[in-house]
Amino acid sequence: MPKIGIIGGSGVYGVFEPKEVVKIHTPYGRPSAPVEIGEIEGVEVAFIPRHGKYHEFPPHEVPYRANIWALYELGVERIIAINAVGSLKEEYKPGDIVIIDQFIDFTKKREYTFYNGPKVAHVSMADPFCPELRRIFIETAKELGLPVHEKGTYICIEGPRFSTRAESRMFRQFADVIGMTLVPEVNLARELGMCYVNISTVTDYDVWAEKPVNAQEVLRVMKENEEKVQKLLRKAIPKIPEERKCGCADVLKTMFV
């Protein structure tokens, strides 16, 4: 079974052709869609469309626990997560790729843990993302000449609404990009000792910029971003070693009370 899982949108189908569909019912319900298994450049991967096959789940209703558990149950050890984000800083331009290294949780009512009792866990999130996967994707993006930021802080809001201008100006003080789907995905993966890397693609500037958003321009950038991510996945995934040496699974030794 695949050791690598991808959670993202329909753009993944540009590099991935499903060969098998696995329906899984987890202790947390059904995932966003049946897990699709196929190959990217000869490497077996499992894919879940985060928002559902037909984009039926808004960000605050995505079954995050079921998605992560389904991949875990299949034997996946590493998760590559792909997100579209808005920019909070001038230097993070539309069309850029950000390999996120930190996040701030501004969500409100999601299911954040697998351990609601009687077993209790406090997982370390000081460094939330797999250093080995981050290195591979940063180096590969540079090799391909893609516009990549090696670091970035992602603030995750509840959604589904976008920010007010006042909120956006506040968020600019402590984050670089803004989105709605990183949390609780990243901490759930950590609770199961899974590696997790986030590839965020910038679609536009958030409303702090006070520039009118051109829908056609956003759609154009999103299409270009899909193509960049497809190139990145094709080139980076074959570089991921069989054996993990990152220490992501070590959190399991210290997180239980």
UniProtKB/Swiss-Prot annotation:
<comment type="similarity">
    <text>Belongs to the PNP/MTAP phosphorylase family. MTAP subfamily.</text>
</comment>
<feature type="binding site">
    <location>
        <begin position="204"/>
        <end position="206"/>
    </location>
    <ligand>
        <name>substrate</name>
    </ligand>
</feature>
<keyword id="KW-0660">Purine salvage</keyword>
<feature type="binding site">
    <location>
        <position position="180"/>
    </location>
    <ligand>
        <name>substrate</name>
    </ligand>
</feature>
<dbReference type="GO" id="GO:0006166">
    <property type="term" value="P:purine ribonucleoside salvage"/>
</dbReference>
<feature type="site" description="Important for substrate specificity">
    <location>
        <position position="163"/>
    </location>
</feature>
<keyword id="KW-0328">Glycosyltransferase</keyword>
<dbReference type="InterPro" id="IPR035994">
    <property type="entry name" value="Nucleoside_phosphorylase_sf"/>
</dbReference>
<protein>
    <recommendedName>
        <fullName>S-methyl-5'-thioadenosine phosphorylase</fullName>
        <ecNumber>2.4.2.28</ecNumber>
    </recommendedName>
</protein>
<comment type="subunit">
    <text>Homohexamer. Dimer of a homotrimer.</text>
</comment>
<dbReference type="Pfam" id="PF01048">
    <property type="entry name" value="PNP_UDP_1"/>
</dbReference>
<dbReference type="GO" id="GO:0019509">
    <property type="term" value="P:L-methionine salvage from methylthioadenosine"/>
</dbReference>
<feature type="binding site">
    <location>
        <position position="10"/>
    </location>
    <ligand>
        <name>phosphate</name>
    </ligand>
</feature>
<feature type="binding site">
    <location>
        <begin position="50"/>
        <end position="51"/>
    </location>
    <ligand>
        <name>phosphate</name>
    </ligand>
</feature>
<comment type="pathway">
    <text>Amino-acid biosynthesis; L-methionine biosynthesis via salvage pathway; S-methyl-5-thio-alpha-D-ribose 1-phosphate from S-methyl-5'-thioadenosine (phosphorylase route): step 1/1.</text>
</comment>
<comment type="function">
    <text>Catalyzes the reversible phosphorylation of S-methyl-5'-thioadenosine (MTA) to adenine and 5-methylthioribose-1-phosphate. Involved in the breakdown of MTA, a major by-product of polyamine biosynthesis. Responsible for the first step in the methionine salvage pathway after MTA has been generated from S-adenosylmethionine. Has broad substrate specificity with 6-aminopurine nucleosides as preferred substrates.</text>
</comment>
<dbReference type="InterPro" id="IPR018099">
    <property type="entry name" value="Purine_phosphorylase-2_CS"/>
</dbReference>
<dbReference type="GO" id="GO:0017061">
    <property type="term" value="F:S-methyl-5-thioadenosine phosphorylase activity"/>
</dbReference>
<keyword id="KW-0808">Transferase</keyword>
<dbReference type="GO" id="GO:0005829">
    <property type="term" value="C:cytosol"/>
</dbReference>
<dbReference type="InterPro" id="IPR010044">
    <property type="entry name" value="MTAP"/>
</dbReference>
<dbReference type="InterPro" id="IPR000845">
    <property type="entry name" value="Nucleoside_phosphorylase_d"/>
</dbReference>
<feature type="binding site">
    <location>
        <position position="181"/>
    </location>
    <ligand>
        <name>phosphate</name>
    </ligand>
</feature>
<feature type="site" description="Important for substrate specificity">
    <location>
        <position position="215"/>
    </location>
</feature>
